[in-house]
Swiss-Prot record:
Primary gene name: ruvB
Keyword field contains DNA repair: yes
Residues covered by region (Small ATPAse domain (RuvB-S)): 202-273
EC assignment: 3.6.4.-
Native organism: Prochlorococcus marinus (strain MIT 9215)
Name of the featured protein: Holliday junction branch migration complex subunit RuvB
Length: 352
């Protein structure tokens, strides 16, 4: 019988979650059921940190709809994952003093699924559809009259026996969320009266989010540590809170403390191969690959083949942040490493 030591050191610590890319902004199962994360959600616009311009625009639209006693115009929120689109949808409903019913487009497989959702709505309620760009064509077309005239136009039967039936709907507000604005068809996009982009967060905004959450989970972060973690969080609250939870794991299990310093954060994130820029091994491999081609533009499919990854994942998950921090540029001929990106990658080695 083999005897395995239960001692945990710095090198072994990351193995428990090595399959998870911590800097991926998409939600993971752990985050869907984490009660602390639910407690961290703001209850109103005042508690929502960041997105000041967006909140101001929405505040005016909401107050105007309340003043006129009309439903808020259908609203489209777009931006990278993890920036708060779902949270904003719930806050909009809260400000309107109504319920928010939530659905995801992939789960709306058949026309009758969207019909059921629409018929279940009450006057003034909010219907939130996440990943709305993934609605199939038939389902999307049913939304046209529902959004425009608050009615459903249904075709009953087939061939010569087919007949049309119109069902009036209560006045409601549809809030759609998407990470791929260009993938939404023009007829659907044009039916949203309000369209707002959710931007990446500033370091100061992320720092405040981190400080607030650290109090909920009984961690002590000094001012420098909270700002340092904010800089690593890729402008995304979801990533900031995820990294903070992993730092907590390291602090409590390896260092036996609830006091978080800059040095402890560096050690914890190094165990997951995350560096001071918030980049992980996949980001660095991408940049290394470009650096090997000596300022020659490379097509996305060629990069994906070279790295053994999916091109769509690279385009929508890896590249946006590399572009944001000035390490990557897209050209008609392909992807190019910038001078800043080259300086960064030259300072690293392949065995980070």
């Amino acid at each position: 019988m083999a005897i395995i030591s239960s001692n945990i050191d710095d090198n072994d610590f990351s193995l428990r979650k090595k399959e998870l890319r911590l800097v991926d902004s998409k939600v993971i199962p752990e985050e869907k059921k984490n009660n602390n994360l639910n407690l961290a959600r703001p209850l109103n616009f005042k508690e929502f940190i960041g997105q000041e311009q967006l909140k101001s625009s929405l505040r005016i639209a909401i107050d105007a709809s309340i003043f006129r006693k009309e439903p808020l115009e259908h609203t489209l929120l777009y931006g990278q994952p993890g920036l708060g689109k779902t949270t904003l949808a719930f806050l909009i409903a809260h400000e309107l003093k109504t319920k928010c019913r939530i659905a995801t487009a992939p789960a709306i497989e058949r026309p009758r699924d969207i019909v059921g959702l629409l018929l279940g709505l009450k006057e003034g309620e909010v219907l939130f559809i996440d990943e709305i760009h993934r609605l199939n064509r038939l389902t999307e077309e049913l939304l046209y009259s529902a959004m425009e005239d608050f009615r459903l136009d249904l075709t009953m039967g087939a061939n010569r026996g087919a007949r049309c039936r119109t069902i009036n709907l209560p006045r409601f507000t549809l809030i759609g969320a998407t990470t791929k604005l260009a993938s939404i068809s023009a007829p659907l996009r044009d039916r949203f009266g309000i369209s707002q982009k959710i931007e990446f967060y500033t370091y100061d905004e992320l720092k405040q989010i981190i400080v607030n959450f650290s109090r909920l989970i009984n961690l002590n972060l000094d001012d420098e540590a909270s700002y340092d973690l904010a800089k690593i969080s890729r402008g995304t609250p979801r990533i900031a809170l995820r990294l903070l939870r992993r730092v907590r794991d390291y602090a409590q299990v390896v260092m036996k403390t609830n006091n978080i310093s800059v040095n402890l954060i560096k050690k914890a994130l190094n165990s997951y191969q995350i560096d001071e820029k918030g980049l992980d091994s996949l980001d660095r491999n991408y940049l290394f690959f470009l650096n090997q081609n000596k300022n020659i533009p490379i097509g996305l499919d060629s990069i994906a083949a070279g790295l053994g990854d999916d091109s769509s994942m690279l385009e929508f998950v890896v590249e946006p942040y590399l572009i944001k921090i000035g390490f990557l540029t897209r050209t008609p001929r392909g992807r190019l490493l910038t001078a800043l990106g080259k300086k960064y990658i030259d300072s690293k080695n392949e065995n980070f």
